[in-house]
Amino acid sequence: MAITVHCDIVSAEAEIFSGLVEMVIAHGALGDLGIAPGHAPLITDLKPGPIRLVKQGGEQEVYYISGGFLEVQPNMVKVLADTVVRAGDLDEAAAQEALKAAEKALQGKGAEFDYSAAAARLAEAAAQLRTVQQLRKKFGG
């Protein structure tokens, strides 16, 4: 029986996942993080992108998060995210369209242009698309 740690993923709307996992893989501020049982305590912000849970027995679940925080304690991993979507529920065509729209918005700068908001939309659309593509590559979906 594999060693596990309790993991909670909570969005602004609801608890998305609560259960035992062998590992959590997420995209932190300084790069990808692999959290396994016994990991040192940690708090970090999470960038938009995929978060992968390796559950007991090796089964995997992938979610898209739009950003948030990760807290690691000796017997618990908690993800507090702004928005969480099961990766399988993401629409690749819609993500590509959002990416194109965000790129176009960045090109059409006017006097009232909010660069940081446009850049944030671009980063989120790119992260959604990356999540869909990783899921397809990993699981042949």
UniProtKB/Swiss-Prot annotation:
Top-level lineage group: Bacteria
Cellular compartment(s): Cell inner membrane
Record bears the keyword Cell membrane: yes
Name of a matching Pfam family: ATP-synt_DE_N
Alphabetized SUPFAM superfamilies for the sequence: Epsilon subunit of F1F0-ATP synthase C-terminal domain, Epsilon subunit of F1F0-ATP synthase N-terminal domain
GO cellular component: plasma membrane; proton-transporting ATP synthase complex
MF terms in GO: ATP binding; proton-transporting ATP synthase activity, rotational mechanism
Membrane topology: Peripheral membrane protein
Coiled-coil intervals: none
GO biological process: proton motive force-driven ATP synthesis
Record's keyword terms, sorted: ATP synthesis, Cell inner membrane, Cell membrane, CF(1), Hydrogen ion transport, Ion transport, Membrane, Transport
InterPro entries to which the protein is assigned, alphabetical: ATP_F1_dsu/esu_C_sf, ATP_synth_F1_dsu/esu, ATP_synth_F1_dsu/esu_N, ATP_synth_F1_esu_C, ATPsynth_dsu/esu_N
NCBIfam families cross-referenced by the UniProt entry: ATP_synt_epsi, PRK00571.1-4
Function: Produces ATP from ADP in the presence of a proton gradient across the membrane.
Sequence similarity: Belongs to the ATPase epsilon chain family.
Self-association and partners: F-type ATPases have 2 components, CF(1) - the catalytic core - and CF(0) - the membrane proton channel. CF(1) has five subunits: alpha(3), beta(3), gamma(1), delta(1), epsilon(1). CF(0) has three main subunits: a, b and c.
Protein name: ATP synthase epsilon chain
Organism: Pseudomonas aeruginosa (strain ATCC 15692 / DSM 22644 / CIP 104116 / JCM 14847 / LMG 12228 / 1C / PRS 101 / PAO1)
